[in-house]
Every structure is written in C-alpha cells, then in structure tokens.
Amino acid sequence: MKKDVILWAGAGQIGMAIARRIGTGKKIIVGDKKLENAESIAKIMNEVGFDVVPVQMDLSDKTSILKFVETGQTYGEVAMFINAAGVSPSQASVETILKVDLYGTAVLLEEVGKIIKEGGVGVTISSQSGHRMPQLTAEEDEMLACTPTEELLSLEMLQPENIKDTLHAYQMAKRCNEKRVMYEAVKWGILQKYVCKMPGRQTGNSR
C-alpha cells in the first residue's frame, strides 16, 4: 500500500522541523538545489525512523520543479507540501532573488495545487520583510496575486529600474509569496484544502 506523500522544497532546519512534526507514516520527498543538502537531511531523518527520499530540485527552474512534483507522484498521492526553499538578500543578486523566491514559489504553488489530493495541506515559509517596505497599491497587490505565473517577472514594478537593491527584491518576493498563497488557496478549494503563510497569517480553512 502506497503512503501519502509530502513534497518538501528546501532542505533546511525550518523545513525539517515541519517535516518531523507531520511526516510520521508518510513518504517524504525532499528537494534542494544542492543534492548533498537533501541527502544530509534525509540521512538525519531516516536514522530516526522517517521515510525520506532526497532529490535535486532548482526552484528557479520550472522544468526542475515539474520533475520534483512528478517524482513525488510516483510514490503515491501528494497530501502535504512544505516550501522552505529560497535565497536571502545577502546571498544572491536581484535577478536571482526574483527568479527563485518570487517566480519559483509561484510555480511551485501552482503545480502542487494541480495534483494535491482532496483535503491536502501546504505551508510556504515567507518573511516579515514583505511588510517592511513602502505600501503597495491594491492594484499592485492584485497583480502580484493574479498575474499568470509566466508573466510575473515582466511586471513593471519588478523591472531593474524599479528595484533598488537586493533587500527591495527580497521584500517584493515575500510580498508576492503572501498574495500568491491567498490566490492559490482559493484555487485549491478553501473548504477542503488549506494553505498557510508563515510567520503570522494563514488562509484557507482546515475543515
């Protein structure tokens, strides 16, 4: 009998804490850009009784994301989703931050939403940085939430001349994460599936 599957992006300590809490009896697929990171985390968890498979997954690459989701489906129905992947403003360029933290997260939410089982749950790690920036207009928030994924990086507000530095790029990415989770929660099915953003708020309904 196949187990329910947890898709977990970003092999770090926050993701592991969540996976340990919800992963008993589940097949856990952990993806990270650096396979050795995923392998290290999988080893730690497997040694204490979890069932974890490490894979390489690049959050900036849609093909890699699709392969990650497909790999999870080979083990069973995807019932849970953890997105703890991303880069920080001290690690990466403006372009990379927007490609990974903003675009990649939007793709991952969209693709997991297409296949997650009824009653499935998901969590995306965000940041207070999304609120530590100048106020966006309602129209700008709506664009971050609802623009087709492949058009997100073409938005005027995300063009190089409108992004001051890596911190600003990170703030915009995290603001987009929040709005995208709200948008995808509706598509996932508010009364049957549940998505939340950390820290702070949650959207959807646990019933």
Label the predicted regions.
Residues 1-29:
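Canonical Rossmann dinucleotide-binding motif of NAD(H)/NADP(H)-dependent dehydrogenases/reductases
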Residues 25-40:
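Conserved glycine-rich Rossmann-like NAD(P)H-binding loop of the short-chain dehydrogenase/reductase
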Residues 45-63:
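Rossmann-fold cofactor-recognition segment
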Residues 50-51, 71-83, 90-91, 117-120:
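A glycine-rich helix->loop->beta "capping" turn
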Residues 60-76:
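Conserved Rossmann-fold cofactor-binding substructure of NAD(P)-dependent oxidoreductases
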Residues 68, 82, 108-118, 177-181:
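Hydrophobic positions on the long internal alpha-helix
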Residues 89-91, 118-194, 199-207:
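Catalytic loop of short-chain dehydrogenase/reductase
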